[in-house]
Amino acid sequence: MVYSYTEKKRIRKDFGKRPQVLDVSYLLSIQLDSFQKFIERDPEGQYGLEAAFRSVFPIQSYSGNSELQYVSYRLGEPVFDVKECQIRGVTFSAPLRVKLRLIIYEREAPEGTVKDIKEQEVYMGEIPLMTDNGTFVINGTERVIVSQLHRSPGVFFDSDKGKTHSSGKVLYNARIIPYRGSWLDFEFDPKDNLFVRIDRRRKLPATIILRALNYSTGQILDTFFDKVVYEIHDKKLQMELLPERLRGETASFDIEANGTVYVEKGRRITARHIRQLEKDGVAQIEVPVEYIIGKAVVKDYIDENTGEIIVPANMELTLDLLAKLSQAGHKRIETLFTNDLDHGAYISETLRVDPTSDRLSALVEIYRMMRPGEPPTREAAENLFENLFFSEDRYDLSAVGRMKFNRSLLREEIEGSGILSKDDIIEVMKKLIDIRNGKGEVDDIDHLGNRRIRSVGEMAENQFRVGLVRVERAVKERLSLGDLDTLMPQDMINAKPISAAVKEFFGSSQLSQFMDQNNPLSEITHKRRISALGPGGLTRERAGFEVRDVHPTHYGRVCPIETPEGPNIGLINSLSVYAQTNEYGFLETPYRRVQDGVVTDEIHYLSAIEEGNFVIAQANTNLGDDGSFVDDLVTCRSKGESSLFSRDQVDYMDVSTQQVVSVGASLIPFLEHDDANRALMGANMQRQAVPTLCTDKPLVGTGMERAVAVDSGVTAVAKRGGTVQYVDASRIVINVNPDEMYPGEAGIDIYNLTKYIRSNQNTCISQTPCVSLGEPVERGDVLADGPSTDLGELALGQNMRIAFMPWNGYNFEDSMLVSERVVQEDRFTTIHIQELACVSRDTKLGPEEITADIPNVGEAALSKLDESGIVYIGAEVTGGDILVGKVTPKGETQLTPEEKLLRAIFGEKASDVKDSSLRVPNGVSGTVIDVQVFTRDGVEKDKRALEIEEMQLKQAKKDLTEELQIFEAGLFARIRDVLISGGIEAEKLDKLTRERWLELGLADEEKQNQLEQLAEQYDELKHEFEKKLEAKRRKITQGDDLAPGVLKIVKVYLAVKRQIQPGDKMAGRHGNKGVISKINPIEDMPYDENGVPVDIVLNPLGVPSRMNIGQILETHLGMAAKGIGDKINAMLKQHEEVAKLREFIQKAYNLGDDVRQKVDLNTFSDEEVLRLAENLKKGMPIATPVFDGAKEKEIKELLQLGGLPTSGQITLFDGRTGEQFERQVTVGYMYMLKLNHLVDDKMHARSTGSYSLVTQQPLGGKAQFGGQRFGEMEVWALEAYGAAYTLQEMLTVKSDDVNGRTKMYKNIVDGNHMMEPGMPESFNVLLKEIRSLGINIELEED
């Protein structure tokens, strides 16, 4: 493998054995591709905005005299960029402008004669845009639209599995689900009649819908049944015989023909009998008259003389009717062929319960069911039925629905109309009847071929269409009402309903969620999440066990591990690493094609539907060098089952061992050794890890760390290769390689880094450069690390030296004992940034004012404010400190005559305002790192706002000037090259100013042209700079668009540094979570023979019952990695020769059986080897991919190479006594995470505060400054101790004895420490509740 200069800085040793056939594709593509499809113009009009416009336009007036046509649309440029939107609290969006054409037709002239055409571009609201990282900025906060897994449109055949009816009879049903429109259900009842429901309303006999489609009884029977023909000859009945129909029946008479008795009466007819009948060619047999009695006729039989119907279709024959038929001269009688086995008389039976007789009565019946209480007219009934399933405006199966529909009915073509046809309905009924007859299978609803993904673009398009439909109604009204000659398209369209629909979706839909921004992994996982909840999906309460369960089709598409614990388990899933959606929205996963038992590198993506037809081998199947299967029998999956197949039967093979799991689970090393429940917790807890101040890459990783860090977008990645020309904490400048430059550009890339920004979870986002001046970089190299990344690898926690042993009860029940060294070295110190806002409004009594002049506040409290009343940057504040001074006008109070007199003499007093300043919340302390002031247009800016503005202008000018200088330097370097190659001496050039160079002339015409081009570029650059500066100035100085009634907003940002402390929650990556019980002095920690103490002591009892053995293997491998690092460190300290160093590191990389990674250090320069060694001295990072990790033997070899015992256990000594522990202890390095459940955020203590209104008891919870509930069990505890007075105090004055509380306060003030308990308020509540039940209880007081 070829490594770039940056990648050579630290290479992770990979234990993976299987070759990597397919690289992990961009992890956020599901979001970005979907949204791109939405806003990109699709010439076919199948997707996105184009599809929405085409489906609604043209809009015609009711009279048909005019219409509004859609021509095209374009999206404008967003006003603010992403960062500005976040600061200002606005939505990152672009204006949508649509070109519309209004056509007015001549009224009197023939149809289609155009009178006037007007074309105009109309504004249709704002469309939120997706940022480069797949998020949306809505009102200043980053949100993610989660993809939804919903039932695909199409037709589904299902059964109630015998749960509906008490008899346990299985009732089958079919449901036609459109993409939009009414649902159509067919279902059997326990009596085997077929019913239909529209939109889950009350059921009607299914034949009603056939009658509404203009089928007569005869046609219905003809469509659904085979016929049996009887002929009457001389009072004898002859039946046409199709022997196959007799199979399985019991003969009710002797079956004979040509004098041969084939089946005797009472005998069961078998296949042998049928073969005999067929062989002898028996076409007719004589049957007794009783045999035909009770059979239903196929058509109406009419007396030809009188024209009356003797026997109507579907009537059962009796002897009388038979006689009548014979008299009327009907010699040939056709009846329905039915039996109890596989030809049920369902439709025939249904017709008997059908109250309707013709089309009109059927339409009226459907109208009554859909619109109960409204009088039906023929026209209304026909319209309603037409619009239900046969109108393109109201009903759409969509391409997916039609494809699923046709596949289900086994049709050849998969494309077709979006509305239903007669054939569609009849074929669905036929298939349902076949299933009831025992032919065919019901569908599996949870199969991923029946559930599809609806992503951002599709949901936004649907919402946009909803808005357009609302507008359509208004436009129709206007086209019919207005004076069309003066109207323009602009006057027709009101953009409000459209932007309201879009805004509502992005702002408050259940699937538009506040982005989880704890760390890069939580961001990526949130964007790859798939939810079955949301509009048009399931609800938590209704979702049963089956929907939540892992299904065989989840393999490689949806992760079986990562899902939340709790009520949403199984409803919210995560996309697997390689999964993607196909054009229909179904999930597909890649496989390698197998041909004649040889695995090729050809990759096919298969959806769950396609996968069912193939035999697929596992990724860990043994292959020979030529890619053929080594074993004769191979473990494969086929049709959801796993079994052994011969090598010739295999069609495909998995691409990778980590194909099954999601990104989160693929980061857990030795996942294959963990119990699934714990792996689930591990995957979920990684997302809660807080980014630490000093990041530390995991010693034991899986090789996915780099992909996650880069794809999450928190790092700065080189767009093009080149050399680092300049680097500081806030910007990196790359001089682009000439071969990657566009013609005629300066060839400079500038990367501005993000510094100390608050994330959604109040963690700190900051980027740090990880390249040095003059270094070569290649495209895709990481230039700067973001939060939780280390040299471009994901680093969520810290490598800690841990020991598994009990330690004085401090690790009872998953607690952890942590060494003080961890605190001293700031290993788990995190920075949290809080945003506090102060809003100044215009009240009825006058405007609120932000000022330092606050009534009744001492000097000390104002010491941190400037003259505008806003806190300084850099001030250290604690709970209760004023951040922004604000006063609110008070209502006029009634004044006494004396006060009035004083007022009159001394003028206005400041007592008519009250203090409403922004203060630091209780329990929070930190440093002010930023202040922003937003002022409404037209309101005068205060001094502080002007200062901030001036500072921003200076900064913007400085940044732009520096950028210009960088670009200029690049340009002039190229101009100089051209001039020198054109024959001008370098010394002469250096004497001239750079601007004069452009005036020089060259003899060579080509060179002169180049020079002129560069001169043009220089002018353009300067002009561009002026334009940018002016735009920046305008943005900074313009007023802000604030909510109605708001004059000013001041935002103060506090940075809080949190060190680790007892009560904080920590976890490993294997679901091994715990709380810190004690921070122990270093000298008391257990230490090894070299005197090195451990950092954390974990309880060994936490491992066996939880079955997450992965943590033990990680500990051993971590120890080995550290051992190798220690050896490299020792060699560096002793200044060993580079050759020795190279040899040792090479040995470490080569270790392992048949590993895929090949690192050849001979291709590295000495300097590169030394730099690699410098980065490896703290431990050699190791990758052990999921299901393809390091074997026990390899771990032992690595331990041996590091000079450590292969048992992974060492002798420890007690730090307090110095005595050796009795047994050897497992010690090693485990990657530990600090989770975002910090004791500082949870802990609080109530003094006095608010009380609940009804019970008068203190509220609960930190947010309400509540108390702790003293519950039933706690009362028992005090009763057991006999602490009567303490108990009385708890239940009265400390809780809800209102009078007792006030008395006690008075007593304490008077210095009298007595308490008089009274009546608890909850007793009165109890009395009232009992009274509400009609029992009067009165309290008699002595």
Swiss-Prot record:
Cross-referenced PROSITE patterns: RNA_POL_BETA (PS01166)
Gene3D superfamilies: 2.40.50.100, 2.40.50.150, 3.90.1100.10, DNA-directed RNA polymerase, beta subunit, external 1 domain, DNA-directed RNA polymerase, subunit 2, domain 6, RNA polymerase alpha subunit dimerisation domain, RNA polymerase Rpb2, domain 2
EC number of this enzyme: 2.7.7.6
GO cellular component: DNA-directed RNA polymerase complex
GO molecular function, one term: DNA binding
CDD domains with a match to the protein in the record: RNA_pol_B_RPB2 (cd00653)
Similarity comment: family membership: Belongs to the RNA polymerase beta chain family.
Record's protein name: DNA-directed RNA polymerase subunit beta
